[in-house]
């Protein structure tokens, strides 16, 4: 089996900058140009959201982006078609960075378990992050995903006890995803000495109880915070701030330009 792009990337000694983008946000036709802009400006991994009508773990910005994506016609099926087009350079320069789909279980169940996994791999998806999939209940899914060569990423939070951190680390295929705060995505601001000290203590604790790499997300908005996370973790994820920057765009071209400018500033 061909080595997964994520596995190849995490073997490198580099800090990762991971983008989260909701397809077809804010306008239809934006996805492929945005993927190209993010790749060209240094995104190491791109997470694509799978829009869902009841995203309980997401903040208002991502909830609105998901609703906009649904109105703009995004489905699991055509999202996989978009990834396929991105990989072969149909509508944009060929996207070669790893792509992770992040979303809730219901749309994937509706699509059909193994059928989804097979189609995801065929399209060029590298990994999955499902926030509502408890690690304790994931054994069957994890084995099926691994059999298709897909990376599975699980979440760690500031209140995750050490033994559970170790379990999540063992189950995550290549790396884990640490929530920087106990909040819905994008709603928390990382600021102030107390917050910084708490985050540092938390991530040091994660480091002590993990063998694999981990990235940090939720609430990271600028280069200063990216650099802060790079000192403590193996990568930073930026999503809500990117979507906020794109919100006022009216065309796919304008969306891509704003995405590129925003991402370049993070580097």
UniProtKB/Swiss-Prot annotation:
Active-site positions on this chain: 47 (proton acceptor), 58 (proton acceptor)
Reactions it catalyzes: (1S,2R)-1-C-(indol-3-yl)glycerol 3-phosphate + L-serine = D-glyceraldehyde 3-phosphate + L-tryptophan + H2O
Record-listed E.C. numbers: 4.2.1.20
Matching Gene3D superfamilies: Aldolase class I
Pfam families: Trp_syntA
InterPro entries, per the entry: Aldolase_TIM, RibuloseP-bd_barrel, Trp_synthase_alpha_AS, Trp_synthase_suA
Keywords: Amino-acid biosynthesis, Aromatic amino acid biosynthesis, Lyase, Tryptophan biosynthesis
Pathway this chain belongs to: Amino-acid biosynthesis; L-tryptophan biosynthesis; L-tryptophan from chorismate: step 5/5
Self-association state and partner proteins as the record states: Tetramer of two alpha and two beta chains.
Function: The alpha subunit is responsible for the aldol cleavage of indoleglycerol phosphate to indole and glyceraldehyde 3-phosphate.
Family assignment from sequence similarity: Belongs to the TrpA family.
Name this polypeptide is given: Tryptophan synthase alpha chain
This protein's encoding gene: trpA
